[in-house]
């Protein structure tokens, strides 16, 4: 979602790899614990995105954009030698290194939401929420399937990630086998679920 905001456009396609390496056998999980996805944008820009959920591993969230003259990071622009060309000089309320030492963006989101509620003013982030989520679905579908995915084709595909009528009695879309293990998406054979019913 940061790349979508930075580029002011949505990805056209994605391809990637992923897997389940560290989740404990028998732990209720049918999802990968790591993904590496390359997103392609209409202007020719390519974004490499990686994530992982490894206990005891490095825990950080950051973005870095590389251009012809250097790097753009949250709160700072440097050239290839590391010389700072620009640095955010505004308030520094966050102690997080991942936020570049600047105001924590997650706190800003909460502040804006709370202010809108208190002042009874509209705050509509539905478009950003929907396009951000769908960009993640695009990347995950690419890693699960092992095949390149196109944004518009996936958006138009006949599938549903949620049952039409979800109740406490609904059968989950993924259930464990007799040993308690959940099936994992397998590249080359994974297919999105068609419309599900409860």
Per-range role (PLM):
Residues 1-198:
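Contiguous beta-strand/loop segments that form the cofactor/metal-binding neighborhood of enzyme cores
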């Amino acid at each position: 979602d940061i790349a979508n905001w930075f580029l002011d456009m949505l990805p056209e396609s994605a391809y990637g790899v992923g897997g389940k390496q560290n989740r404990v056998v028998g732990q209720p999980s049918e999802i990968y614990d790591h993904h590496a996805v390359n997103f392609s944008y209409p202007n020719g820009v390519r974004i490499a995105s990686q994530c992982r959920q490894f206990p005891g591993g490095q825990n950080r969230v950051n973005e870095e954009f590389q251009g012809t003259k250097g790097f753009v990071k949250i709160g700072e622009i440097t050239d290839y030698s590391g010389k700072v060309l620009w640095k955010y000089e505004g308030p520094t309320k966050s102690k997080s290194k991942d936020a570049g030492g600047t105001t924590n963006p997650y706190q800003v989101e909460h502040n804006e939401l709370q202010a809108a509620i208190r002042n009874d003013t509209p705050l509509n982030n539905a478009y950003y929420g929907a396009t951000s989520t769908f960009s993640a679905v695009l990347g995950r579908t690419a890693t699960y399937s092992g095949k390149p995915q196109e944004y518009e084709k996936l958006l138009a595909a006949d599938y549903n990630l949620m049952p039409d009528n979800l109740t406490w009695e609904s059968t989950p879309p993924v259930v464990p086998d007799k040993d308690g293990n959940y099936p994992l998406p397998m590249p080359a054979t994974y297919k999105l679920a068609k419309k599900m019913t409860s």
